[in-house]
Amino acid sequence: MGQDLPLLLSAALGKKVNRPPVWMMRQAGRYMKIYRDLRERYPSFRERSENPELSYEISMQPFHAFKPDGVILFSDILTPLPGMGINFEIIESKGPIIEDPIRNLNQIENLKELNPSESLSFVGQVLSSLKKDVNNEATVLGFVGAPWTLAAYVVEGKSSKNYSLIKSMAFKEPGLLHKLLDHFAKSIGEYLKYQIKSGAQVVQIFDSWAGQLSPEDYDIFAGPYQKKVVDIVKAEHPETPVILYISGSAGVIERMAKTGIDIISLDWTVDIEEACKRIPSGIGIQGNVDPGILFGNKESIKERIDNTFNKTKDRKYILNLGHGILPGTPEENAQTFFEHGKKLTY
Amino acid sequence: MGQDLPLLLSAALGKKVNRPPVWMMRQAGRYMKIYRDLRERYPSFRERSENPELSYEISMQPFHAFKPDGVILFSDILTPLPGMGINFEIIESKGPIIEDPIRNLNQIENLKELNPSESLSFVGQVLSSLKKDVNNEATVLGFVGAPWTLAAYVVEGKSSKNYSLIKSMAFKEPGLLHKLLDHFAKSIGEYLKYQIKSGAQVVQIFDSWAGQLSPEDYDIFAGPYQKKVVDIVKAEHPETPVILYISGSAGVIERMAKTGIDIISLDWTVDIEEACKRIPSGIGIQGNVDPGILFGNKESIKERIDNTFNKTKDRKYILNLGHGILPGTPEENAQTFFEHGKKLTY
């Protein structure tokens, strides 16, 4: 069963597999020396993520190093913004800066609908190259940011600690925010479809900042727009597995399960055994391993992987971290994570 | 029933009250103009929190402005550190800097046992003045940081994003970390007893960073040391209510309930109705209101308070935010929070 499909895709589709697939969020990046070397030559993040040769090369770095079961596009959740008329820059160690933060109706009404094949053709190019070259030895993953998280960026104008600007908008001018969220949902849905057509076999939606919402606000500003994105994708690609990740999601995992996604990617702040009970059995689970464990040693890493795996044996499970791998992680510890992960068996 | 006791203390003791008491975490601070003015004259945070006249004056600012049901000592969770031989400075907008971060056994073995009446007499002075002057029109609260959170500060050396240094110690040299946590638990227990003897009628333990631990690590590095602090306090003051707060606690609230505390202070990322089901009925609940709601308007603030209160009617409940009030919060919105909170009735 599923012998013709790569392991991660098979598992995500619910087919019987011999071991859980393994990949890492943010598996290409700063913790790899080869990436830091390339960054010296190409210091602009936007160039690295928007020049198709560079994005392709970086996407493949962890594949060459560790042979993970998933190869994810090297890109950023903000990459589609310029195609909607929102310009941004990423300043090393400071994060993204939105050129002209979105604060009023006029700005929202002037946003362009995203035409991915026009403004994001470099992404299509990278995904089709990855699909061809990875050649089903791994599964190619695409990804997007969810509407709430994109809205938080463009309203705040930068990485925020307190989200006071977008919350002010949410509580004072909810109609304005809903217009923005709706625009993003449609555009992001189109963008995911474009990624799938270009080669992505599994896609992940990051609503990184939805964990900053109370569950009552999640039901108004995050959940419905996650669902809208999923509905747009599933209407055309019902068979493509969709993963949803939220950082700080322990209070809303039941809600995540109701958005039409196939797999919930858990952070590490919830016991995966309890999460399995709270999430309907048809929905798969990914992640949950504290990325901080990779600052330990081989023994602690292996033990944590085993503990996590043992709690998920009767579930569809994809081994992953509970958050992106952290800068400063020793590469040999990432190696251990992949090596040990591949030794697991059902 | 409880007529002689202030409202918050009565409610915390489980006595029948006519309305939930209301106070705010970090209710004295940057959002108040009177505090910012004082800060101009006394720019050193350590001076403001360690000079008993200033600490007293600041503690009383919100009492004069809003008449909350609780008056909490103006201090910092790091304040006891110098009494253990760990020096620190707080740099405005950058947070605390530990002079000589704790990284090895020798440093841990050289830590002094805290003698609060010697090194923290200014805290005793402030609490006894507050107790006298507040005169049971409100309840006087003391507080401490829990061992894990203090350890995270002194090992990382500053506010951390990823906690890679303390996690490295936890996973590679757990014995070392346990020694440090044990030292803090004993000292912090003594410090709380000193606060109670000096005038604190209710005390709150902040394990602000325990939400960064997976539940499995929480059970090793956070929970047992919270419990140890509580045991030390309860041995001498079984009647003093103890509140426990953790930021990002949605995945561990059942565990918090097992530490011997009386009241769990919830952040806003969990539905309080679900939390009430997960927490044994004998344990009280505090908080849960998103501090971001105070960037909304009067109507949204009142509605949120009502929604929260309505979900807790059969529980011991203390109205509070789910986190400290945020810098930049309009003072009139804090006013609305207190005013509306005091209009609730059982």
Swiss-Prot record, chains A, B:
Annotated localization: Cytoplasm
InterPro entries: UROD/MetE-like_sf, Uroporphyrinogen_deCO2ase_HemE, Uroporphyrinogen_deCOase
MF terms (GO), sorted A to Z: uroporphyrinogen decarboxylase activity
Enzyme Commission no: 4.1.1.37
Pfam families: URO-D
Keywords: Cytoplasm, Decarboxylase, Lyase, Porphyrin biosynthesis
Protein's GO biological process: protoporphyrinogen IX biosynthetic process
Enzyme class: lyase
Transition state stabilizer, annotated site positions: D76
Reaction equation(s) it catalyzes: uroporphyrinogen III + 4 H(+) = coproporphyrinogen III + 4 CO2
Pathway(s) per entry: Porphyrin-containing compound metabolism; protoporphyrin-IX biosynthesis; coproporphyrinogen-III from 5-aminolevulinate: step 4/4
GO cellular component, as recorded: cytoplasm
Major localisation: cytoplasm
Binding positions for substrate per the UniProt entry: R26, Q27, A28, G29, R30, D76, Y153, S208, H323
Oligomeric form and interacting partners: Homodimer.
Family: Belongs to the uroporphyrinogen decarboxylase family.
Purpose of the protein: Catalyzes the decarboxylation of four acetate groups of uroporphyrinogen-III to yield coproporphyrinogen-III.
Name of the protein in its database record: Uroporphyrinogen decarboxylase
Organism of origin: Prochlorococcus marinus (strain MIT 9215)
